[in-house]
Amino acid sequence: MIEPSMERENGALTAATTTTTAVTSPPPMASSPRQALVERLKDYGQEDIFSLWDELSPDEKDFLVRDIENLDLPRIDRIIRCSLHSQGLPVAAIEPVPENWVSTVDGRTMEDREKWWKMGLKTIYEGKLGVVLLSGGQGTRLGSSDPKGCFNIGLPSGKSLFQIQAERILCVQRLAAQVVSEGPIRPVTIHWYIMTSPFTDEATRKYFSSHKYFGLEPDQISFFQQGTLPCVTKDGKFIMETPFSLAKAPDGNGGVYAALKCSRLLEDMASRGIKYVDCYGVDNVLVRVADPTFLGYFIDKGAASAAKVVRKAYPQEQVGVFVRRGKGGPLTVVEYSELDQSMASAINQRTGRLQYCWSNVCLHMFTLDFLNQVATGLEKDSVYHLAEKKIPSMNGYTMGLKLEQFIFDSFPYAPSTALFEVLREEEFAPVKNVNGSNFDTPESARLLVLRLHTRWVIAAGGFLTHSVPLYATGVEVSPLCSYAGENLEAICRGRTFHAPCEISL
């Protein structure tokens, strides 16, 4: 559920008068709404919220009352109870994903790729694809308080993650119009649904507006907020961030399902004729937004959901992997900590790969029908993941629990799920940690982009000069020039580029 805004209001109370006595009635006592809320909170064991009531100013009392009134207490209590109860319960054993559930890079023919590419472009041309961006996070671990999508990883162009992704959408729209149109080329529009959080919403909207939506039409972008939930102690009590406000946190990237439903954007998608939804996380600089090949594969398989996967780099890599839960059970994702050493290292003797090798990289495709089903099913389920974190509280940081759903929590609901292998060096360059960390830094992502684009330019007949070792530099190809290395010959053949630089139109 998406909570309403909780900005302070300083409206004066209006005094009531009677004509018979001309005596002004006293203003309602601040304790009246408080007393009613205390009685409600007692039903859920949360009445301690008001323990410091007498020490609060009138404005603080008003803020606290409205903070509590804005909560769906029955829903939140159900989530807390169900989630705490689920801890420690036995779970079904896991099995490797069957080989025939995965479209591997080596197993695809050129004919497959061509067929899926054209199917995807035709579907995009017909307006049947929508794109959902998960971008509720701030760049805190990158040393920035801005929305993570505003981050510039240091490419020659200086473009942010948001701009790169917007320009990929522009490129796909152009490709669909050029390849599919019979007769005069008509414009193609992919609607972009951008999920923010209460912490990033205003800044994200302003960023897009100030950059003129990076060439997209303003009305083809819809912003919506994911929900928040109170942080709780290990026994389920609300944690107070200040004496007059609850500590809250976003409800995880799996909150996208409820957020789309509560914002009525699933209805909006249906009204636009959208049947398929591409969903991805903001912090992957190599993401192929609205990938026609992935879309065509998804349609060809007739699945309800699909995910791109990459092979684990090594047994101890700290990534979630796809598994089957229970004998012949549904597909789901388990964290690396759930795999013991022997399972993580086990080899499939037939393929020579790790048995549990398919890493989740938050690149998904869904049918709209399935999203509607999941939005209802996950809400009824009410079991959230409990993440133990340091929570800001009125007594300093304290250990507590954040309640989160994950995007992959939907997969057990799917009647069919397809996995689509992609190459890490082509489609997965995460930006999660500050430069100087061991992995997933802006610098490591920048180098992955430059190396990939350098290969594109050389394949298209271009040449490079460089004053530093080539492994530390390269060229950047603007998404407005090429989506995945295509159509570069006219720009690159016979030309020499001095790295680092951006190749643009």
Curated annotation (Swiss-Prot):
Residue spans crossing the bilayer: none
Biased composition (Basic and acidic residues): 1-10
CDD domains, alphabetized: UDPGlcNAc_PPase
Superkingdom of origin: Eukaryota
Nucleotidyltransferase is among the record's keywords: yes
InterPro entries found in the cross-reference section: Nucleotide-diphossugar_trans, UDP-sugar_pyrophosphorylase, UDPGP_fam
Motif Substrate binding positions after renumbering to this chain: 134-137, 335-336
Thermal characteristics: Optimum temperature is 30-37 degrees Celsius.
Pathway(s) the chain acts in: Nucleotide-sugar biosynthesis; UDP-N-acetyl-alpha-D-glucosamine biosynthesis; UDP-N-acetyl-alpha-D-glucosamine from N-acetyl-alpha-D-glucosamine 1-phosphate: step 1/1
Reactions catalysed according to its record: N-acetyl-alpha-D-glucosamine 1-phosphate + UTP + H(+) = UDP-N-acetyl-alpha-D-glucosamine + diphosphate; N-acetyl-alpha-D-galactosamine 1-phosphate + UTP + H(+) = UDP-N-acetyl-alpha-D-galactosamine + diphosphate
Entry EC no(s): 2.7.7.23, 2.7.7.83
GO biological process per UniProt: embryo development ending in seed dormancy; embryo sac development; pollen development; UDP-N-acetylgalactosamine metabolic process; UDP-N-acetylglucosamine biosynthetic process; UDP-N-acetylglucosamine metabolic process
GO molecular function: UDP-N-acetylgalactosamine diphosphorylase activity; UDP-N-acetylglucosamine diphosphorylase activity
The protein's required cofactors: Mg(2+); Mn(2+)
Tissue spec. comment: Expressed in root tips, stipules and mature pollen grains.
pH dependence (record): Optimum pH is 7.6-8.0.
EC top class, as a word: transferase
Control of this protein's activity: Inhibited by hygromycin and streptomycin, but not by gentamycin or kanamycin.
Subunit: Monomer.
Family listed: Belongs to the UDPGP type 1 family.
Known function: Uridylyltransferase involved in the biosynthesis of UDP-glucosamine, an essential precursor for glycoprotein and glycolipid synthesis. Can use both UDP-glucosamine and the 4-epimer UDP-galactosamine as substrates, but no other sugars or NTPs. Acts redundantly with GLCNAC1PUT2. Required for gametogenesis and embryo development.
Protein name: UDP-N-acetylglucosamine diphosphorylase 1
Organism: Arabidopsis thaliana (Mouse-ear cress)
